[in-house]
């Protein structure tokens, strides 16, 4: 394989282009964030990177709260639009016909049209350069009940989530496996069935041979039960 060496860049792809809601309930705002990720399990934490000059930056920094709304195929136009327009000039919720619904644990709002909403409280802000990194604890998750199966398990494959890759919005493709499948042992019940089938086949062949010899000796053949 032939390779070229480029200078260091931000080519870690794909990533979820999330809609982040922030601001007060009477004047909420939306910002599209392409750089976000899970950073801790206990406590549950995630991060978002925002340029200091963005209108939403000071809203998040002052309130210490925001909501990450997962991106879906039906939201792709709003996601793109909210990423290029400023909340200083327009009401993004109204312009994109989105519903600002009350959050359960934070003082800002969530996007009702998004199937999963992660309510977050900022724990630390780290200036990095072009962007500030907001570290936050996820204090609540709002889930559309239509994504739950009969046992209450969350089925995100029903949500039609999208990703962002080097300037393009992409739908997710087919399932390739589940966590741990590469080391998972085969179920023993299958092995037992295979073994039982092999024994039955061997017995049948043996019985056929015996019956053939009995016929040759003019003796009535055996009957398998």
Where are the regions that the model predicts?
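Basic, polyanion-binding surface patches
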Residues: 1-195, 225
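Short, low-complexity intrinsically disordered segments enriched in A/P/G/S/L with frequent Arg
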Residues: 200, 204-208, 212, 217-224
């Amino acid at each position: 394989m032939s390779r070229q060496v480029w200078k260091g860049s931000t080519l870690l792809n794909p990533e979820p282009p999330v809609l982040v809601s922030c601001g007060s309930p009477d004047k909420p705002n939306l910002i599209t964030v392409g750089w976000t990720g899970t950073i801790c399990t206990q406590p549950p934490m995630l991060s978002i990177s925002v340029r200091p000059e963005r209108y939403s930056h000071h809203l998040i920094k002052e309130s210490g709260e925001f909501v990450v709304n997962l991106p879906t195929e039906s939201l792709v136009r709003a996601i793109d639009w909210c990423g290029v327009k400023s909340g200083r000039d327009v009401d993004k919720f109204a312009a994109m016909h989105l519903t600002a619904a009350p959050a359960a644990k934070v003082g800002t709002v969530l996007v009702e049209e998004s199937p999963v909403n992660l309510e977050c409280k900022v724990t630390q802000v780290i200036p990095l350069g072009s962007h500030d990194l907001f570290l936050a604890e996820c204090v609540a998750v709002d889930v559309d009940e239509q994504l739950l199966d009969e046992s209450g398990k969350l089925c995100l494959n029903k949500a039609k989530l999208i990703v962002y890759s080097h300037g393009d919005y992409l739908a997710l493709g087919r399932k390739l496996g589940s966590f741990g499948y590469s080391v998972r042992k085969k179920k023993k019940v299958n092995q037992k069935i295979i073994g039982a089938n092999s024994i039955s086949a061997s017995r049948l062949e043996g019985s056929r041979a015996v019956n053939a010899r009995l016929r040759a000796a003019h003796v009535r053949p055996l009957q398998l039960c």
